[in-house]
Amino acid sequence: MGNQSFKTLSIDDFLQITGWPDFSKLIKKEHDKVLAVQLPGTFVNFSKPQNSLKNRYNEIPCWDHSRVILIPPSAKYNYDHTDPSHITLTPTEIPSTYIHANFVNGFKEKRKFICCQTPKKNTCEHFWRMVLEQESHIIVSLTKTDKGGFVCHEYWLNAEEGMEIFGRYVIRTLEIIKESSFTKTRLRLTDVCTDASREIHHFWYTDWPDVGNPISPVQILDLILQMNKKRKELTQAAGFKLGPIVVPAPKESVEQEYFVP
């Protein structure tokens, strides 16, 4: 490793060490050292009191240097959920640009992904605002949803012809396709205040264990291949580069680190 705290080993040296009786202890000791390294950067916006309820976990910061900055709304919009066309405008309390989400580079492509925490009940509107503002067309969810929103609030309706409304954003479910290990869904995202609308392709993988990695890496590889294929198709049809792929995960850690190439 390149850090002064760690010794760089050749392949032969490493293979020799694997035969030592205390090999596992050495690995754990080095792992603890890695975790103890203080990362450079600030997370001022994450720490602001007005943003605390938007964060799912206090111990996982949102770094300032790569965070997604929302465009602050000029007004707050309230809707009659039985009639999305019924709009009430009120002055916004505090224009907010914060969402727990960061740009992440892909292989040979800068800002290919946005890795974010799974939406909470009070951040679903911010989530869809981010998707629309960033010109994103693909979402890859790596976790199950739950009605209580403890892991991930249901930010779309998993039923054809279903509809969810979060603030000014209406999300309609157009089509659901069941694959062998994940579900593909076509959604229609609409901002009822500006009439901006976009079709969203949602990939949903729900077999990630609570601890560890997926049992079948082939399933994840298939998901990545289909995701990249769809993105290529959409890019060719649009004639311009699409926005980042949005990847929500509960703790923005294990799942995203494993998935994001």
From Swiss-Prot:
Q: Name one GO molecular function term.
A: protein tyrosine phosphatase activity
Show the SMART domains listed in the entry. Answer: PTPc
Domain named Tyrosine-protein phosphatase is located at 26-261
Listed Pfam families = Y_phosphatase (PF00102)
Which superkingdom does the taxonomy of this entry point to? Viruses
Q: What family does this chain come from, according to its entry? A: Belongs to the protein-tyrosine phosphatase family.
Q: What protein is this chain from?
A: Tyrosine phosphatase-like protein H5
Question: What organism is this sequence from?
Answer: Microplitis demolitor bracovirus (isolate Webb) (MdBV)
What is the name of the gene encoding this protein?
H6
